[in-house]
């Protein structure tokens, strides 16, 4: 009897670690004005995810100066030769292994109806490694529509498993981003992997314990597998 219980415990632990390893999310973002950085901060207050910021290799560039001359030049170079690595601006090296993640959420600004050039560089270099992974897209812009950015993403990550909806956060609704992100996560069924609508807790919030069906427990749980503050634990 003891050996059976021990074997069951080991199997549960292996399942737990396997689930955590295969269901990880990476949020990749580039931010020039700071809007995308704010979006990522709000997003990661609602989900458990690692974060990777894309940085240009050359610092201090003013992409909007002289009538957006530099930004336009970078995008035109990509348009002219989209399959040539030399067409893309250099970015800082990244130390993330995409094999560790099941889901990639890309947060990028829109530049003149296209994806920001620096994010295009990252996806040109690593988009092939996203094949078969869940891919989400959050786009920040002043007012323009996002179809060009979506097209750029699908060109650079052709074999990603895209969520059913993309999220567009513009100047007029940026302050309402928390509600928009929460609704988007629901629309794409992001939380179905755990069956829990929301488990991320702030440091000031009391601990919440759920069973595996997503039900909040109001009493001290008995022995078993539960989720506390977004993480599985065994009591």
Each PLM stretch: what is its role?
Residues 1-6, 235:
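Positively charged n-region of N-terminal signal peptides that target proteins for export
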Residues 6-15:
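Sec-dependent N-terminal signal peptides
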Residues 14, 162-193:
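Glycine-rich phosphate/pyrophosphate-binding loop and the adjoining helix
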Residues 21-106, 115, 182, 186:
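N-terminal beta1-alpha1-beta2 submodule of the flavodoxin-like/Rossmannoid cofactor-binding fold
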Residues 45, 98-99, 124-132, 156-159:
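Short, conserved loop/helix-junction motifs that constitute active-site signature segments
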Residues 131, 136-169:
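Short, glycine-/small-residue-rich phosphate/pyrophosphate-handling segment
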Residues 191-213:
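Residue-level detector of functionally pivotal "anchor" positions at catalytic/ligand-binding pockets or at interdomain
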Residues 225-235:
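C-terminal tail/sorting-segment detector
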